[in-house]
């Protein structure tokens, strides 16, 4: 039994002002990568909260608040199918991860440099793919 047509139909999401748009593979991949990036960012923020005290903990709380906002932003495309929301979330997280890579480089930590840089690069490729498919 071929589930692809049924899956495509189930993934049709309304976009205000744009009618219905099918969730393409490019949209799905970009949305997954963006969501993973947001979850990882929030995870690191939560670890920082739990492992720090006083002023450092306060700063970690601010970082977690911003990470949580990005998580919410990255969930909107799943609920609406909006390419615009997805691109906004993806571009924001690309910048955040690239800046995190810069911080990791400054600290001299390869994992904190290459991990975020890799996620940022994968998200960037997914965004370009989505933009090519959507045009």
Report each predicted region and the residues it spans.
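Hydrophobic alpha-helical segments of small multi-pass membrane proteins
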Residues: 90-101, 116-127
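Cytoplasmic-side transmembrane-helix entry/capping segments in multi-pass membrane proteins
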Residues: 57-60, 112-120
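Hydrophobic transmembrane alpha-helical segments in integral membrane proteins
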Residues: 21-39
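Juxtamembrane boundary at the C-terminal end of a transmembrane helix
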Residues: 126-135
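Membrane-helix boundary connector in multi-pass membrane proteins
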Residues: 80-83, 87-89, 99-115, 135
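Core segments of alpha-helical transmembrane spans in multipass integral membrane proteins
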Residues: 34-46, 57-79, 91-99
């Amino acid at each position: 039994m071929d589930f692809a047509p049924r899956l495509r139909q189930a993934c049709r999401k309304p976009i205000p002002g744009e009618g219905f748009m099918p969730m393409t593979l490019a949209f799905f991949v970009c949305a997954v990568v963006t969501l993973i990036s947001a979850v990882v960012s929030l995870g690191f923020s939560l670890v920082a909260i739990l492992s720090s005290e006083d002023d450092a903990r306060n700063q970690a709380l601010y970082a977690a608040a911003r990470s949580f906002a990005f998580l919410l932003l990255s969930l909107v495309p799943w609920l609406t199918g909006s390419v615009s929301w997805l691109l906004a979330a993806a571009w924001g997280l690309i910048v955040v991860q690239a800046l995190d890579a810069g911080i990791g480089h400054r600290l001299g930590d390869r994992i904190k440099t290459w991990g975020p840089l890799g996620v940022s690069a994968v998200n960037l490729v997914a965004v370009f793919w989505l933009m090519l498919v959507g045009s």
